Amino acid sequence: MEERNLRKTRVGVVVSDKMDKTIVVAVRDNVRHPLYNKIVKKTYKLKAHDEKNDAKIGDTVRVMETRPLSKDKRWRLVEIMERAK
């Protein structure tokens, strides 16, 4: 159980739930530009496993790194932090 605590976790917003047991999560990150030293907001998308098809578009969710589940899926849904309004 302690090993699971070392896995990466990310918080993001669900942007797609059209696939069966899969959601697409947009994660926002602040990155410093290497030349201009300006903080730039960067968004990247992850495919995550949603076993019960609980998450809907607009929900804020926490995902955790896991073993490869398919070609693109390397994350799984841990919890739904906030439902979409």
Curated annotation (Swiss-Prot):
PROSITE patterns noted in UniProt: RIBOSOMAL_S17
Keywords, alphabetical: Ribonucleoprotein, Ribosomal protein, RNA-binding, rRNA-binding
Record flagged with keyword ATP-binding: no
InterPro entries found in the cross-reference section: NA-bd_OB-fold, Ribosomal_uS17, Ribosomal_uS17_bact/chlr, Ribosomal_uS17_CS
GO MF, one example: rRNA binding
CDD domains: Ribosomal_uS17 (cd00364)
GO biological process, one term: translation
Keyword Ribosomal protein among UniProt keywords: yes
A Gene Ontology cellular-component term: cytosolic small ribosomal subunit
Domain of life: Bacteria
Function noted in UniProt: One of the primary rRNA binding proteins, it binds specifically to the 5'-end of 16S ribosomal RNA.
Quaternary structure and partners: Part of the 30S ribosomal subunit.
NCBIfam families in UniProt: PRK05610.1, uS17_bact
Family label: Belongs to the universal ribosomal protein uS17 family.
PANTHER family named among the record's database cross-references: 40S RIBOSOMAL PROTEIN S11 FAMILY MEMBER (PTHR10744), SMALL RIBOSOMAL SUBUNIT PROTEIN US17M (PTHR10744:SF1)
Protein name from the UniProt record: Small ribosomal subunit protein uS17
